Amino acid sequence: FSVIFLLFYSLRFFLKQNSALISSIILSSSVFFLQISVNQYADIAVSYFILFSFILLVCSQKNKKLELDLLFLVGLSIGITGWIKNEGLIYSISLISSIIFFQLLNKSFLNKKNYFLIIGFLIAIIPTFIKNIFYTFPNIFLSLNFKEKISFFLNFDRILSVFKSMFTLFFTGNNYIIFFLLFLIYLIGFKKRVNFEILKIFCLFFLFSTSFIFLVFLQMPYDSIEGIINAIYPRWQIQ
């Protein structure tokens, strides 16, 4: 119940009250969301640190007096996301890349205030990389030389298999119905004048994170790609 309560009040930063209420009810009443809340609670934590980062971005735009402090907290929150679990690291890198890319397009990345964002991110993400270097299992892909890595990613059978599995799973089952229904509600209820830049960053984040997930799936054993995607991808979709 606390998750549902936090979800509603978090969405109110971006949506009109009715849209936030309806979307909270739809998401929180889905069987898959309830299963993740109980069995895969780390997924909920990952999702909330990402959501918290977007909320802090909105606050930093509205409160110029605390803008530097809030941007530091944005970077810290994004970096902490990577510590929770492997998916969090993907989201963490995707979101910081989205913010940097957006600011590069606006020619505002060299602004001094962005240093606070980067510093906060580095403080939180460096321990994650140290942990992964010493305490995670070796990755088969990382053990390949440069030529083997190129051949690995140019394996069109593998690329087609991953793309087909992701595309098929995305448009089957109950999850995709919930996803597109929520997306429609968000578009209708989004506070465009207030958070239009945040919407652009989120679109970049969605593109980058999906691309990184695709690259991760490319590293999976070829004979078990479909089974792995079927097991993991729905969690990322609901996140």
What are these regions (language model features)?
Residues 21-28, 73, 194-224:
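Transmembrane alpha-helix segments characteristic
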Residues 38-45:
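Short acidic/glycine- and proline-prone juxtamembrane loop motifs at membrane-interface regions
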Residues 101-102, 113-190, 206-214:
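Membrane-lumen/periplasm interface segments of specific transmembrane helices
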Residues 3-14, 47-61, 76, 93-101, ...:
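Transmembrane alpha-helical segments
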Residues 23, 53, 57, 70-86, ...:
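Membrane-interface alpha helices of multi-pass inner-membrane proteins
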Residues 31-38, 80-82, 128-132, 206-231:
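Transmembrane-helix signature of polytopic, lipid-linked glycan biosynthesis machinery
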